């Protein structure tokens, strides 16, 4: 008798995606982050659902409802902190996943890569609107500052901002619609992730060497299911260490002060995972220029397949490109640090230099280095 998992219409889809999927035999732990992102998304949707049962999206009661969740709801505190720190784990996995794609040349799967970039934008949008919901000082002023950037768009900017606000300032209408967006976007992310997987399974996974692995494939289960379970256990370990021992480590103390439109916090800054982009935004003294640089810092990922001049796919056998890649990582860490610093000397100039270096490495140095490596190998 043929196995039901291979014949049943629904189970067949699951089987082809997670059980009998032919996978390269040599993929490393860097390939774990896809499944970890899936777990993060499921965790965020579940904890978010339980939070939404007790949250009220009204300017008068939003802050109190979050306090009520932490104090009065059974295990509300752990659900709230799992959701807040779960977002941080989500972004750590995202950055690792994108970094893996850049290092091993996975961006040559064009459809998979482009949907991945759209996913990155969608997750960033979700995290931004979510940060506004507790209605603390940083929530309010973060929403005001970031939405205000749209006013830099010529001609339609001001109308666009007022349309998003639902009035002439960030107020009740803004909070209500941000809650609606924050509820719907994760489901859009889940749908996009399925399309992402669909396109990936059309080509099969890349591997560290960047060489086609059709000649050496192994079934996904049990080899990579076991490997993924180990990754998931480690992810949950790190998440729970954060939640139970240092729940506010990555948050901002200003967000424990209720939103007050009459009092601006001394340093307005987003959550840590947006600091690199925020530093690039601040490093340009012109409003429209800053907004363009901010968007370009992520959109530049779409250009990666066009900027690939090497005759090898992966960086595994390209030491000069490897050095450049790690300089880029160091530069992004520098930008993250600068984004959290006040706008004064020497942070301004460091931020400007790091921003220039970021674009210079990706647009100029990486393609040139790849060409030099080709010539050294007499290709």
From Swiss-Prot:
GO terms for molecular function: metal ion binding; ubiquinol-cytochrome-c reductase activity. The keyword Transmembrane applies. GO terms for biological process: mitochondrial electron transport, ubiquinol to cytochrome c. Binds 2 heme b groups non-covalently. Its main location: mitochondrion. A ubiquinone binds at residue 201. Heme b b566 binds at residues 97, 196. GO terms for cellular component: mitochondrial inner membrane; respiratory chain complex III. InterPro entries: Cyt_b/b6_C, Cyt_b/b6_C_sf, Cyt_b/b6_N, Cytb/b6-like_sf, Cytochrome_b, Cytochrome_b_C_euk/bac, Cytochrome_b_N_euk/bac, Di-haem_cyt_TM. The chain crosses the membrane at residues 33-53, 77-98, 113-133, 178-198, 226-246, 288-308, 320-340, 347-367. Pfam families: Cytochrom_B_C, Cytochrome_B. Its cofactor is heme b. Keywords: Electron transport, Heme, Iron, Membrane, Metal-binding, Mitochondrion, Mitochondrion inner membrane, Respiratory chain, Transmembrane, Transmembrane helix, Transport, Ubiquinone. It is a multi-pass membrane protein. It is found in: Mitochondrion inner membrane. It comes from the Eukaryota. Belongs to the cytochrome b family. This is Cytochrome b. It comes from Rucervus duvaucelii (Swamp deer).
């Amino acid at each position: 008798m043929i196995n039901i998992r291979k014949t049943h219409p629904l189970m067949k889809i699951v089987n082809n995606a997670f059980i009998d999927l032919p996978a390269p035999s040599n993929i490393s732990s860097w390939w774990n982050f896809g499944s970890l992102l899936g777990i993060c998304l499921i965790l965020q949707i579940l904890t978010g659902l339980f939070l939404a049962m007790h949250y009220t999206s009204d300017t008068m009661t939003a802050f109190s409802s979050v306090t009520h969740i932490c104090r009065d709801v059974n295990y509300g505190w752990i659900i709230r902190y799992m959701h807040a720190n779960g977002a941080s784990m989500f972004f750590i996995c995202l950055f690792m996943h994108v970094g893996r794609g850049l290092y091993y040349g996975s961006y040559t799967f064009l459809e998979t890569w482009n949907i991945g970039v759209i996913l990155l934008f969608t997750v960033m949008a979700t995290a931004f609107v979510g940060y506004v919901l507790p209605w603390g000082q940083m929530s309010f002023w973060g929403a005001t500052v970031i939405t205000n950037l749209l006013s830099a768009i010529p001609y339609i900017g001001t109308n666009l901002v007022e349309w998003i606000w639902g009035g002439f300032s960030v107020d009740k209408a803004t909070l209500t619609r941000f809650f609606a967006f924050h509820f719907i976007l994760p489901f859009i992310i889940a749908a996009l992730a399925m399309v992402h997987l669909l396109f990936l399974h059309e080509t099969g996974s890349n591997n560290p060497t960047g060489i086609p692995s059709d000649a050496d494939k192994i079934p996904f289960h049990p080899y990579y299911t076991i490997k993924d379970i180990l990754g998931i256990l480690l992810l949950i370990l790190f998440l729970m260490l954060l939640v139970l021992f240092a729940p506010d480590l990555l948050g901002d103390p200003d967000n424990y002060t209720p939103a007050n439109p009459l009092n601006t916090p001394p340093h307005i800054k987003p959550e840590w995972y947006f600091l690199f982009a925020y530093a690039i935004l601040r490093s340009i003294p012109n409003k429209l220029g800053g907004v363009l640089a901010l968007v370009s810092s992520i959109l530049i990922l779409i250009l990666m397949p066009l900027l690939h001049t090497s005759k090898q796919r992966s960086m595994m056998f390209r030491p000069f490109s490897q050095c450049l890649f790690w300089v880029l990582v160091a530069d992004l860490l520098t930008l993250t640090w600068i984004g959290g610093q006040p706008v004064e000397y020497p942070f301004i100039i460091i931020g400007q230099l790091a921003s220039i270096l970021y674009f210079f490495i990706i647009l100029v140095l990486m393609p040139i280095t790849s060409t030099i490596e080709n010539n050294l190998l007499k290709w």
